[in-house]
Every structure is written in structure tokens, then in C-alpha cells.
Amino acid sequence: MQEQMSRRDLLKLGVAGAGALALGAVNAQASALNAKDVKFDEEWDVIIIGSGFSGLAAGLKAAQKGNKVLILEKMGRIGGNSVINGGGMAVANNPVQAKTNIKDSKELFIADCLKAGLGINHTELLETLVDRGMDAYNFLVENGVQFKEHCAHFGGHTVARSLLTTNDSGSGYIQPMLEKFEALKDKGCELRRRAKFDDFVLDESGRVVGVTIREEYRFDDKLYSDDLENTSGTKKTLKANKGVVLAAGGFCRDKIFRKLQDPRIPDDVDSTNHPGATAGALLKAFEIGAYPVQVDWIQFGPWASPDEKGFGTAPILTQQGTFKYGIAVDIRTGKRFMNELADRKTRADAEFKILREKPGAYPITFADTKMAFKDLSEEVVQKGMASGKLVGECATLDDIAKKYGVPADALKETVKKYNEGVKAKKDEFGKQESALSEINEAGPFYVIRLSPKPHHTMGGLKINTKAEVISSKTNKPIPGLYAAGEITGGTHGASRLGTVAITDCIVFGMIAGENI
């Protein structure tokens, strides 16, 4: 792996950016500010960096204890990645499973996560996530989140255990939690947009007692590295009497840091993440001694499409649609090449193999129109169909073959063989029996092209089961510093199962708010 940035990368940064990078290397030795050397502009009990699932959960829990809570969001809109995902949350033994006679267990959920994570999960964190899943569910319902009356069966899960918001979106969590938090304004709580975290303030014992920020900050996605080059905003220093919670998310949009972890990711690759998903807050925690955990494991979403930007709607239309009620096919051969409901890494690797062998030969996934999107809200389906580019509508299998350059006879034989496996209740690629349903060979069909995109950074800060960040200097918690969500590492191991991120974020956000 290339340890230093290339000359080309430095040229992209420009003179100012390269200077900032050099300055950053010097400043890394200096770490954070000392409380005795600063004058605080404001005083709070708890300061939270990030306004997504983890940040709002931590804020609501901390506020329940009577704390004055400030949530800081660097972007102009709240929620980060949390508002643009599919809204699925995996909880074992949830009420919807009970109503629909789905048998599940803590042990089965953990086993599924360990299999996807290649066994390198930090099991104490994973067990906490599973054990407190129902607490998270109840917390969300109490705060106004509305769920559908059925569970979805996502890839890598042995059974259907994923709860879904009624609008098939993470915004179904964020909006009601935000309303609850903003209603606490008269109790001294506030959420501030365009407020970027810059650094920590420590006292002489090493305790985190505050942060430096910039208000009226304007994120600039035209910069090669916003963290290094953007100097916008007015500086302030804020005191946090009880501590700071890092809930700043992952770094899938950070061109520099993600390339250091995986040099195969080109600068121009699209990502499912929002533009502000960078490593700035994570690196500041490393500077004050936080342990890094499994930072080089970056997950690609195998359900994304090259025919739309960012997260889009393909992940929802495929995961809850064509992957479940249809199949995925290699356009070169007309044959299936993977279990459509395997874990994310398995599927992404299978798709990358095809694209390495023939760049541009995007695999397709399809199902008949009667079944394809039947579990999805009309709003999501209409959004997916609106562009006219994402979802192909084909009357017959011959039409699919002609439109996407697939061998027609092989395609027909593939569908026939799949249906025979459905009838025999045995799929050649191991698709779970409960997820098998016949494809109407007569059509018509909905078709989506596939191309994996960077989606979730598996690693991050080492935390314990109290959401305390662990120091590499002492192997003990850094006093006053907590973290939750994608900025942490270890829980998911090498690859996260779909819909476990929301559970992770809510559970450890709650825990941080309870313990701070």
C-alpha cells in the first residue's frame, strides 16, 4: 500500500490544500487545546457532534437526565447519511416477528453477524447491540417512529428480522426524533446547523472538557479535501461539563483517508454517502490517543446502480424488491452468479469479479412487475421510476436480452431453472427457502443494473459497552469522551449486515446519552 500521497494527489489539493496537509502533519503532534489556555464562549452539560441516528438518540437520552444538550451539525441539513438510507432496522424477537410467527433468537442474530463479519467482530459490542435491540425499538416508538406491520428479509440474515419505517426511509426516524429534541429548547437544549467541530479541549488530567468549532461553516464539495482546505466560519470554544459524544459518522466521501485505507478506490468513484461523510472528527480523536479499530475495512453496497447518483432508490428497490422476488444475472452469460440475499461482501465481490473481467458489463437484477415492488411504498416506487433511467421496463425475457445484451436462450433457461428450484425448495446458490418465489416467465419485468458503491466504513474508534472511547495511552476510557455509530469500529467486523447499522446507531447513541 502506498504510504504517502502521490504528486498527483497533492496537485489536486492545490497549493493551499497541500500546505494545509503539511500543517496538519505538524499539528498532529500537538494534539488538542489545554483548558487553561482558552476562554470558553459558551457552557453546556453535553455536546454531541453529529445529528444522525446516534446523535439524536444520545441527545434525547442525555436530555432526559436534565442535561443542557447541544447537538452540532456541520452541514446545512440535519441527519447526514441517516436521512437517505432505506429505513430498515434489525431487531431479534421483535413484536412484528411475534405477530407473523417468525422464529428468531439472540444466538441466531449474532451468528449471522459473525458470519458476515468473518469472525473478527468485537463480540462484547455485538452482544450489547443485540441485547438492547428491543430497548431501541421501544425508545423509537415512544419518540414517534412508525413501523410497517411486516419484517423484511435482508441479505445475510437467516430470517426476516428487519423492521421498516412506513416511508421506507431513514427520515422516518430522524424527523420524529428531531421534533422531540427541538421541543426541549425551553429546557436548555439546542441543535445548531453549519457548526463544524474542529478540535477537543482537554484539562491537565487529559479529560475532554470542551470543543472548538466554527459557526456559519459552509461545506464545499468542490474542494479535494474540505477538512483540510475549508477555512470558512467563525471560531468559538465551547465547554462541556459532562462530556462530548462523537456521532459524526463514517468517511466514505473522504478521498484522502479512504484511499489510504484502500488504494483501489479511485477519486471519482460514486458513493452512497452524503457529501460530508469525511474523517475529520475521527482523526482528531486519534490525535488525543483513541484506539483505531479495523479502519481499513470499507464496505461496498452490492445493490447500488450506475444509473443514479449517490444512494438513490436502487438500494431499496433491489433489497426489498428484485433481489427477493427475482434474480441477478451476468449479462455476458445470461446466468446467475450469486445468492441475491447473501451478505454484502459476498455479493459485492461477485459483482466486482464480473466488472474486473469486463469493465462496463454491469450485472442486472429483475423480477416480474406483479411481485417486484409489492412490499414498497408508492412514494419510493414512483421516485425510482421518475428518472426513466434507473428502472428498465421490459415486456418479455427477449426484450431484456435485447435491451441489456444478454444471450436470450441462456436467460430463459436461467429463469426456468430458478423456478424449478423454487418448486423444489432448494436454490443452487443457497437463497433461503423462505425467500423463494417463482418469477412469471411471461413478464412483464422491472430491470435494474448493478454496480457496487462505497457505503459503510466498518472501522473507527474503539469503544466499550458504555460507549466510552478507549485510549491507546492507558487502555482505559478517555474521560469525558463517548462515541456511537459509524465513527466507531469493531461491532460489525469485516462486513456489516444490512439494517444492523440503525440498530447499532440507536443502541450506542442511547448508551452514550445514558452514561455521560
Enumerate the predicted regions with their spans:
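Conserved redox-cofactor binding core of oxidoreductases
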Residues: 131-235, 255-257, 305-306, 422-442
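Glycine-rich loop(s) and the adjacent beta-strand/alpha-helix scaffold that form part
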Residues: 219-308, 508-511
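A glycine-rich dinucleotide-binding beta-alpha-beta segment and adjacent secondary-structure elements
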Residues: 410-495
